[in-house]
Amino acid sequence: MVGAMANNGRIRSAFPVTNGSKDLTPNSAPASTTGSEYGPVEFTREDVETLLNERIKYKSKFNYKERCENMMDYIKRLRLCIRWFQELELDYAFEQEKLKNALELNEKHCVDMEVSLKNKEEELNMIIEELRKNFESVQVQLAREQTEKLAANDSLGKEKEARLSVEKAQAGLTEELGKAQGDLQTANQRIQSVNDMYKLLQEYNSSLQLYNSKLQGDLDEAHETIKRGEKERTAIIENIGNLKGQFSALQEQLAASKASQEDIMKQKGELVNEIASLKVELQQVKDDRDRHLVEVKTLQTEATKYNDFKDAITELETTCSSQSTQIRQLQDRLVNSERRLQVSDLSTFEKMNEYEDQKQSIIDLKSRVEEAELKLVEGEKLRKKLHNTILELKGNIRVFCRVRPLLPGENNGDEGKTISYPTSLEALGRGIDLMQNAQKHAFTFDKVFAPTASQEDVFTEISQLVQSALDGYKVCIFAYGQTGSGKTYTMMGRPGNVEEKGLIPRCLEQIFETRQSLRSQGWKYELQVSMLEIYNETIRDLLSTNKEAVRTDSGVSPQKHAIKHDASGNTHVAELTILDVKSSREVSFLLDHAARNRSVGKTQMNEQSSRSHFVFTLRISGVNESTEQQVQGVLNLIDLAGSERLSKSGSTGDRLKETQAINKSLSSLGDVIFALAKKEDHVPFRNSKLTYLLQPCLGGDAKTLMFVNIAPESSSTGESLCSLRFAARVNACEIGTPRRQTNIKPLENRLSLG
């Protein structure tokens, strides 16, 4: 069998150890680079070191063409060397695999031989045992016959007649004994032959083990050779990287020299085409800049018109007030006229004419009041539009404040004592006053919603901001406030109640309706949804169908969801489930699925307290087939976990860890806002998963709006004051003008340098 193995599949010899100037190629198959312009090439250690230490000499320092050609030749030789090393590595891998296969085959053969020998040994032992039993039975029978023979001899005189029969029996027994002895001798011979075969198999097994040891040694030597080859290859790759850096620098110098040399410009037609295309793009950029300047001037003109409208509105309000006074005077006159009608001696006809005139005057005044009210509404719409435009130009984060109604069991008189709303024209609908320890704290935001405001009223104020996502902007809306202040109600609403739907389902309904209406203009949109939560500084995928991937007993997701921001400002979360959606009904189903997976818990401050930050992301990709314009918008809707004090929440155990993680991440958010407000060079976005995820939204690339939710009861005055102060600081942050992500489909074949 060994001979058969040697003849049929000869094991490839091990690679030689490379020392000094010996060849780096294996004995069996020397590596060569086939198909290169240099023909088959083999490298030694001296060749590689000479190639890496080679210094190119140039006839002229400024002859860039010669330097470029020499460098290209040098790079080709380096690539040839690398290719040779790669082939050498493949040979090593092939030899290693072949040795492994041969070793496995021999080991398997040895195991099979050992099993067969053990089986044969057991069979022979059984045969020997059976022969021994037969021999013992024959000996017993022989002893019995000899006893009978002695007894027969003693009674020979008396039993002469039986002597003949005894002799016959003795002769038969002697014959059987001879046969038994012959069988025993045959069995001994078979045992001897089996023992000889066993010794031969043991010797063959020993030779196989020696051969296996030799193969293992050859394999170890091959491993060492491969390791040394890998180390040398790593060193060569590092040197090649350095050479690539030098080559890149030389390429930059060459490009600079090409730009100043007219003869090379004529030879490099591709460079001329690239410059021409760059000029076209530069002209487009200039046109965009001019268009933006025109838009800025237009906005300035609209701002001037807004001021004029404001003055006109003030005049209309004054006129309205005077007209209201006139109406009251006319009404008084009408009453007096009616009284005079009763006592007057004038004719009924004259009194009726006067009454009709006064009635017509009242109708005219009412129509003028209605016109003034319509102009006032239009002026308010224009004011909102200009205010949003000014905020976008300034780059501020918009802040809306919402005060939730009192809950059953809370003191109904608390709100009037702690929270009030100014009635001045400047602060109407935008101001809120908080009383603490008989001290009044006044705040002004972009919008303030009283407890009577409905979900529809709140959504109306942000509908234009949501529309920006379809226009190609990044939009971020997040709710902030203490636990139990109504953040989740604002964002999600109350399931099953159409009137109390939250901002997230309303935003999606508006986006799907607008997408449908824009189809007539040639727009096609694709929408993708993802939902995650940040629980104890760990990201969980709420749309994952694998429950173990969403949550484990320890509360830590086994998957690693790393956050990455690319050069375009887009955010990617590794291993996060992203689903295409076609209707708001699909998104509602996904929201219900995410709500079931989200972490909630009971504390002393809230029966259903969110124990994690919930992030809903809608990615919008739109293309207009007629204009070939593309837009990419993102809508982030975030329900932050509520801040809480341990003394009030009474959290212990896991709830305590959750509270500490929530407060830490919100504190990191405060540090980021503080750094942005002070315009510091370093903003600590990486201090928490929440701030790092919100970096594009807080860094100036997005339109960002924050809801600060306030609880009206007096026991929450301290937390409400902290929330309002934080919101005021957020409102004062200037993070930059948001960028619209839109472009024209790029050309298929764009010329590039080099």
Swiss-Prot record:
Residues 13-39 are annotated as: Disordered. GO terms for molecular function: ATP binding; ATP hydrolysis activity; microtubule binding; microtubule motor activity. Bind to microtubules in an ATP-insensitive manner (in vitro). Homodimer and heterodimer with KIN14M/KATB (in vitro). It comes from the Eukaryota. ATP binds at residues 481-488. Residues 85-209, 262-394 form a coiled coil. It comes from Arabidopsis thaliana (Mouse-ear cress). This is Kinesin-like protein KIN-14N. The gene is KIN14N. Residues 1-45 are annotated as: Globular. Residues 74-86, 207-754 are annotated as: Microtubule-binding. Belongs to the TRAFAC class myosin-kinesin ATPase superfamily. Kinesin family. KIN-14 subfamily.
